Amino acid sequence: MGCYLMPHPPIIVHEVGRGEERKIQKTIDSLENISQEIKQKRPDTVIVITPHGYVFKDAVSITTLPSLEGDLSQFGAREVKFKFENDLDLAREIMEETKKRNIPIAEVSEELIKKYVLPKKLDHGTIVPLYFVTKHYPDFKLIHMSYGFLPFEKLYEFGVAIKDAINKSDRRVVFIASGDLSHKLTPNSPNGYTPKGEVFDKTLLQLLSEMKVEEVIRMDKDLIEEAAECGFRSVCVMLGVLDGYEVNAKVLSHEGPFGVGYGVAKFDVTGYKSTSLLERFSTIEEDPYVKLAKESLEYYVKYRRPMPVPEGLPEEMYRRKAGVFVTLHKKGELRGCIGTVVPQKKNVAEEIIRNAISAGFEDPRFPPVREEELPEIEYSVDVLMPTQPVKSKDELDPKRYGVIVRKGFRAGLLLPDIEGVDTVEEQLSIALRKAGIRPDEDYTIEKFEVERHEQRVF
C-alpha cells in the first residue's frame, strides 16, 4: 500500500493552465514522480479522499455509483474527462468497518443524488490528481470519498476503518489524500493574506516529514482555521490509514506562487508497529467525576432514566455534598451547561448524575443531545466551593473566581476561567445579563472558587 498527499489546482492541468502551469513546475515534477511510482505498484484500486466531493457537516461520505466520471469543463477543459469503475465491494466493506466504529457515514447512491439534487460528476479534487496518475497507469478501479467536519481524532479513526477494510480484501491499494494547504499564503492570494498561512504550511509539512502523527492531529485549531486550508482533514484520514505501520515519509515539494500552498508528499510503508496510536487518541484520563458525568448522560440517552449511583467511586463522592456544574462541549463549542449552586442531592455523585442529564436535555439554549452526538461530546465538572460576599470589585479575578450577582429574586452565575472572559467587567456584564439585572441597579456580588475536573482527549 502507498499513501500520497497530492494537491488539486486545476491550473496545473495543461489544458486549463495553457502555460501558466509552468509557474508550479516543482509541483508538476513531484506529481509525475508519484505517478511513476504508482505505476510500479500496479494497484487494483485507488482511493481518493477529496474536500470537494459530497461533504457533510456531521458525516464522512463514500460514493456507491457503479461508475464514477467527470471532467474539467467548469475550468474550460471539457476534453479532460475520465470514467472509472467503482470498486463497490471494497467500498461496502469500508462502510461496514466505519459503522462498526460508530462513525457517521453517508452512502452517496443514485437515490441520494436524486433526492437532494446533487451533481453526479467527479470533482476537481479527484480529477486533478488522477490526471497525472492515469497518464502512467490507467488500469485501476476507483473509490471516491469525502471527509466530514468531525473531530480530527474521528477522521483518523475513519482512516483506521479504511485500513481494516483494505486488509480484509485481496486488493493492492493506493490511497490519495487530495488537498491544498493554506489559501492565504501570499499577499496576492485571492482569498486574502495572513502570515499564519506560511506557518501552517511549514508546520504541517515538517510534522508529516517526521511522522509526528499525534502532533498533527493536535495542531492548533485556530491556526488551521485561519490558514483557510482544504487538505488538513484529508491528511487526518490518510494518517489513520497508516496507523500501526512503520512509515518512511518524504515531502517532495511545496510552493504557492498563486497564493495557495501546494504540498506533495509520499508515505511508504516499511513494516509494522506493535501499537496503535488510535488507542491514545480515544483514551480519556479516568477522572472519576468526568467519567460519571459521561456515563450518566450516555445511560440516560439510551434508557431515558437516570442511572443508579455506581459502586467503586472514590469514597469522597459518596460522602461529599456540594453544588456541581456539568458543562458539555462539541467540536470546541458549548453544547450545554447546567448546575446547582447549593447541593440538591445527598452527595456529589448524585449531583453529577442529575446535572449531566440536565446539561444534555434541559439547557434551553440547545436541543436535547442525540445518541449519534455522544462520541463527540467532551465533559467538564465543576464542584463549587462555598461562596463569599464581595465588597469591592478589586477582590475579583475572572480566572480564579466565579461570580454570583443578586437583586431580589433575580440572580446570575458565571463560572471562573471561561474562554473569552478576561476582565472583571466582562465577567460581571455577562452575569448581570443572565440575571436580567441592569448595571445601574443596586446588586450584591458573591465570589466562589471551583474544583474543576476536565476530560483530556489525546
Swiss-Prot record:
Coiled-coil annotated residue ranges, if any: none
Region annotation Unknown: where it falls in the sequence: 1-277
Disulfide bond annotation, renumbered to this chain: none
Highest taxon of source: Bacteria
Residue ranges of domain AMMECR1 in the record: 284-458
GO molecular function terms listed in the Swiss-Prot or TrEMBL record: ferrous iron binding; oxidoreductase activity, acting on single donors with incorporation of molecular oxygen, incorporation of two atoms of oxygen
Record protein name field: Protein TTE1956
